[in-house]
Amino acid sequence: MSVLTSLLLRGLTGSARRLPVPRAKIHSMPPEEELGIMEKAIALTSCFVTFLLPAGWILSHLEDYKRPE
């Protein structure tokens, strides 16, 4: 990168560095009731079935999807 390019980029980003970044004021309360073991197991199982099972199916049948040459 040339010196001129770095000076131009520094000039463009220099003013953006001085702007104040607004902070979100997020406050939350503790949960009214804790999740039980059964709810956690159902959530993990549904995530597994939703994401990992189709990916595993595609990876295990990858040879079937290839074009014959």
Curated annotation (Swiss-Prot):
The chain crosses the membrane at residues 37-60. Residues 61-69 are mitochondrial intermembrane. Pathway: Energy metabolism; oxidative phosphorylation. The keyword Ubl conjugation applies. Residues 1-25 form a transit peptide. It is a single-pass membrane protein. Residues 26-36 are mitochondrial matrix. GO terms for cellular component: mitochondrial inner membrane; respiratory chain complex IV. Keywords: Membrane, Mitochondrion, Mitochondrion inner membrane, Transit peptide, Transmembrane, Transmembrane helix, Ubl conjugation. It comes from the Eukaryota. In response to mitochondrial stress, the precursor protein is ubiquitinated by the SIFI complex in the cytoplasm before mitochondrial import, leading to its degradation. Within the SIFI complex, UBR4 initiates ubiquitin chain that are further elongated or branched by KCMF1. InterPro entries: Cyt_c_oxidase_su8, Cyt_c_oxidase_su8_sf. One of its GO terms (biological process) is mitochondrial electron transport, cytochrome c to oxygen. A motif (SIFI-degron) lies at residues 2-19. It is found in: Mitochondrion inner membrane. Pfam families: COX8 (PF02285). Component of the cytochrome c oxidase (complex IV, CIV), a multisubunit enzyme composed of 14 subunits. The complex is composed of a catalytic core of 3 subunits MT-CO1, MT-CO2 and MT-CO3, encoded in the mitochondrial DNA, and 11 supernumerary subunits COX4I, COX5A, COX5B, COX6A, COX6B, COX6C, COX7A, COX7B, COX7C, COX8 and NDUFA4, which are encoded in the nuclear genome. Belongs to the cytochrome c oxidase VIII family. This is Cytochrome c oxidase subunit 8A, mitochondrial. The gene is COX8A.
